[in-house]
A protein has these predicted regions:
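Acidic, metal-coordinating helix/loop segments flanking the phosphotransfer/catalytic sites
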Residues: 32-50
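Conserved acidic carboxylate
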Residues: 10
């Protein structure tokens, strides 16, 4: 079976490094980005199976990136796990464009992996 590709958009380098190490230890291909502009420029070419995205990025709001993703027919189906230290699931799911799942920071590694495997089942890749 081919390795699954996971795109992580997170501005905190320590969190990005931890998520990358965890996912690579589970045999995923991981690409990490620090800025929303990088996401917009590279998401189509990366063609991820799952996206993990922080809501609060230095150059944009992750919810704006999610709207951009959902508007692009070629990648609109990609499952997205939003993460945030400032929002909780109740507040986040009230937004008009909800992600496939949400996780508050700091997070539990087992919970992160459970959510990723559940999202991979949704992925059409």
């Amino acid at each position: 079976m081919a390795k699954k590709n996971i795109l992580v958009v997170e501005d905190n380098h320590a969190i990005l490094d931890v998520i990358t190490l965890i996912l690579e230890s589970e045999a995923f291909n991981v690409v990490g980005l620090n800025k929303g502009a990088d996401f917009i420029n590279h998401v189509n070419e990366l063609n991820p199976d799952v996206i993990i995205m922080d809501i609060m990025l230095p150059d944009t709001d992750g919810r704006i990136l999610l709207k951009h993703l959902r508007a692009d027919v070629s990648i609109a189906h990609t499952p997205v796990l939003m993460i945030s230290a400032r929002y909780n699931a109740t507040n986040y799911m009230l937004d008009e464009v909800a992600a496939d799942d949400f996780m508050a920071k700091p997070f539990n590694i087992d919970e992160l992996m459970d959510k990723i495997y559940a999202l991979l089942k949704k992925s059409s890749h």
